[in-house]
């Protein structure tokens, strides 16, 4: 009777891994014999856990991330653009300060409002506005920016305040502009109609109140006025001085213009069709300022008394050369015809 064989623990177990490494073809039947499930089936795929831990991301994920981030960047750019457009830089004064809207406001004299002020407008430190000037609830008036540049052609119809020189100086100082002419003392003889010197000859300032200012004809400025007896002024003073061009713009609804013209007539730029200034020749005669205000009582005035047909430029008129020779036949000559008793032209 055969006895059952007992396994020997010391027996050597064949190493299938080493055999597979040495001979893969021979190891395949052995693997199939030991593991029936592995026979005839391919090797299982890598687990998904290892795919997630892949060091290099797939290009599809890169594109998806860039696509998802692109709209956010576009929105942020549009917001920044809209904010930059809305926050526009406000105008600044020459000294770098921001502009203030009350720099042209002047307090009205309370005694003047009650008809009790005994001081003249050139002596009182408060405003004496014209009846056409609008006074706000705080008893303040807004100075005419055009009058600060001698370029207000509205005259007595202007609804803004035309300040005298001493108030002009404080207004110009508040906006950072210095005008040496404003600091000149006002000629008292001129205010009484007694000064025989012209504005260029007198060492004092010839200041004319708003009541004496004439309204410049707008058609004349455009070269279109054909009226023989125009009720508006056809007078143009010299252009504005260069320092006054640096005054910053403050009120967009007002044409920003330095102190009232000494003529009593606002300073205007010449129209495109106007001839060049003739101050350098011998035929230029300065216009009488008192005559423009209907205050000249001199019998033989050495200044010109032009009519409505004469062209006035740089406070002067040009004498008609044909008239001096006795040959002018124009019915409405634009040049000045001096009277026989006049000694203004030699």
UniProtKB/Swiss-Prot annotation:
The UniProt keywords, alphabetically, are:
DNA-binding, Metal-binding, Repeat, Zinc, Zinc-finger
**Keyword DNA-binding on this protein?**
yes
The reply to whether rRNA processing figures as a keyword in the UniProt entry is no
Show the ranges annotated as biased composition (Basic residues).
62-86
List the biased-composition ranges (Low complexity). Answer: 17-41
Gene Ontology terms for molecular function:
DNA binding; RNA binding; zinc ion binding
What Gene3D superfamilies does UniProt report for this protein, alphabetically? 3.30.1370.210
From which residue to which do the C3H1-type zinc fingers run?
103-131, 138-165, 181-209, 211-237, 282-308, 314-340
What parts of the sequence cross the membrane? none
Stretches for region Disordered = 1-99
An example Pfam family from this entry, by short name, is zf-CCCH_2
* Any Gene Ontology biological process: regulation of RNA splicing
| Protein's name according to its UniProt entry | Zinc finger CCCH domain-containing protein 28
Q: What is the species of this protein?
A: Oryza sativa subsp. japonica (Rice)
